């Protein structure tokens, strides 16, 4: 059991126990009171391009707020990301001693396993860590440390929004809390920091959601166009006829009656005026549906590596192809799990082992 007031952190530097009793962000009230900007509202291609350029230049806030909006507003992205994230979160886990472990090492691994089992929110921690799969990185803060039955354990582990951080570039890119002069380094034994790149490069460009932003935007346009199409072409045209010499007030009364019929299927008009219903205009919504389907297939390919575990079109969805795509999903799950295990071993298991060693 650690009894000294100083121990060595993962960087080899001395760490005082009183420094980790409270969360690092406890005094950063400005971050806690921030309200998201929701950049998806009124998003256009030019605004999106500008937002992505700003992220590459160091201002990542709007990009990661957009990522949050995408997962919240696009049901297909939410469903596919949920499949991938929960495929990892539902796996069984264990604390495994090293190869050719001594009896003492095996005993230590078993003790660590019991301590980890005592974390009430560990399943939630695993799920929140997988937030990095879509966004490139995810940070969870220890809400300080406390003694539980004589052992040091985190009070709670809280997911923090990616918009709280900045990604200064150097010899090695870091994740830091937003602030002046390049931000504030994350406190040792204070964070679980998981990095999950979808492609090589700087973190602000390597997130999976960077691939999904354009299909998301195109799909939004197509959904809006389809809604407008259905509104125009799916409702019978209503024409009102007023007699020669009708006053402006009478014309306005007729117009209001037409509007009421469109929404309430009821209305009144003055005697002598007429209402005619024409057939709905003819049109084909297939073009809009085709674009929406293309966007969703692209999203599924990017997230799950294929489409046949998500959608069946009755044409290409054979059992053999479905099995192939399911194997791809398993490969992704296993790769995700390896990255997750490495992060949790470094940022959660190791601190618990050191503080209770």
Locations of regions flagged by a protein language model:
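Surface-exposed loop-to-helix/strand elements on domain peripheries
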Residues: 242-245, 267-341, 349-357
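General structural feature for long, well-ordered alpha-helical segments within catalytic domains
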Residues: 222, 250-254, 295, 340, ...
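Short, composition-biased local secondary-structure segments
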Residues: 261-267
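Structured, contiguous alpha/beta core segments that scaffold functional sites
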Residues: 2-78, 86-88, 93-99, 103-261
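Hydrophobic, well-ordered secondary-structure elements that form the walls
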Residues: 344
């Amino acid at each position: 059991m650690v009894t000294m007031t100083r121990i060595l952190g993962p960087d080899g530097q001395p760490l005082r126990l009183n420094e980790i009793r409270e969360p690092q962000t406890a005094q950063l009230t400005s971050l806690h009171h921030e309200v998201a900007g929701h950049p998806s509202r009124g998003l256009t291609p030019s605004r999106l391009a500008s937002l992505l350029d700003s992220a590459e230049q160091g201002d990542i806030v709007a990009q990661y707020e957009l990522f949050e909006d995408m997962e919240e507003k696009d049901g297909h992205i939410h469903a596919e990301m949920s499949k991938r994230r929960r495929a990892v979160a539902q796996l069984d886990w264990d604390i495994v001693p090293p190869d050719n472990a001594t009896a003492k090492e095996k005993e230590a691994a078993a003790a660590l396993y019991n301590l980890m089992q005592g974390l009430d929110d560990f399943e939630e921690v695993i799920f929140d860590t997988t937030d990095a799969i879509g966004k490139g990185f995810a940070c969870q803060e220890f809400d300080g440390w406390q003694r539980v039955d004589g052992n040091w354990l985190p009070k709670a582990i809280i997911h923090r929004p990616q918009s709280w951080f900045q990604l200064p570039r150097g010899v090695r890119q870091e994740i830091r809390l937003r602030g002046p002069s390049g931000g504030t380094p994350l406190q040792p034994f204070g964070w679980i920091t998981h990095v999950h790149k979808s492609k090589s490069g700087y973190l602000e460009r390597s997130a999976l959601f960077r691939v999904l932003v354009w299909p998301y935007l195109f799909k939004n346009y197509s959904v809006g166009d389809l809604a407008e199409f259905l509104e125009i072409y799916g409702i019978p045209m209503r024409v009102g006829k007023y007699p020669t010499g009708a006053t402006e007030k009478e014309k306005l009364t007729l117009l209001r009656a037409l509007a009421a019929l469109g929404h309430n299927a009821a209305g009144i008009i003055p005697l002598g005026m007429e209402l005619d219903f024409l057939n709905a205009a003819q049109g084909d919504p297939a073009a809009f549906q085709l674009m929406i389907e293309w966007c969703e297939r692209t999203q599924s390919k990017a997230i799950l590596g294929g489409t046949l575990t998500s959608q069946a079109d009755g044409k290409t969805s054979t059992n053999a192809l479905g099995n192939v795509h399911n194997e791809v999903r398993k490969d992704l799950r296993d790769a995700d799990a390896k990255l997750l295990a490495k992060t949790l071993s470094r940022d959660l298991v190791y601190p618990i082992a050191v503080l209770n060693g």
